[in-house]
Amino acid sequence: MRIEKIGNATLYLGDCRDILPTLPKVDAVITDPPYGIGFPYEGYDDSLENLDALIAGFMPWCLANAERVVVTPGISNVQRYPQAAWIGAWTWETTATFGKLGYSQWQPILFYGSDLPGFGNVNGIIKSDRIHFQGGAAKIDKSAGEVHTCPKPLEFMVRLIGRFTRSGETVVDPFAGSGTTGVACHNTGRAFIGIEREPKYFDIACRRIDDAQRQGQLLPAEPAGEAQQTGLALGP
């Protein structure tokens, strides 16, 4: 098992099901797991059977050892996860034709835990959490090389971490990918523990987080455009 320590970030190369049991209790888990989309990519067979095995392998540890757990499961997988305390959504508006063609323009967010600081003012979440993306697409930082196949936008992860964790807390991402959650933790003053099974993306994550810590905040400037992404809190 390879371990890299970069400032207040620690990254593990390996399977989260093997590594999570070796970690201490943490403040939060914030992660974007595989979606079970049904075909192999990046050396992993993303079948529903493998997704179910992953959920059974990582979620019990998260719920038992983290004060808060935030998961973006994919629109078709909510029922595969344990019942959440809250279900939220991130949505986007765009002038593109995706909506007209029947593609979803929202994704669910599952929130677990009784200590959820972001839900202190539900109306505030609905009205104020707006992140703008040019053309409705995620603005991905490619300065450190190739990024992950399915990354979340840095701005989105910064908003999620800032809303549902507190400064100085520790965030674990069992599916770290190219390190977006780790960069967002740096930008918001959180410690980070990331786990990634693919060596290529592990190396990219290490470089991106190292660059973020060397250069200070890497938050990209607010891009112009009509599209907007809105954080929306829904009831349990």
Segments the model singles out, each with a brief description of its role:
Residues 2-203:
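Core catalytic lobe of class I
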Residues 2-6, 206-220:
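Short, conserved SAM-binding/catalytic segment
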Residues 14-18, 223-232:
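Conserved SAM/SAH-binding loop
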Residues 123-125, 216-226:
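Short, flexible loop/turn segments with low-complexity composition
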Residues 130-134, 220-223, 229:
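Generic signature of intrinsically disordered, low-complexity, basic-rich segments
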Residues 234-236:
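Intrinsically disordered, low-complexity and often Lys/Arg-enriched segments
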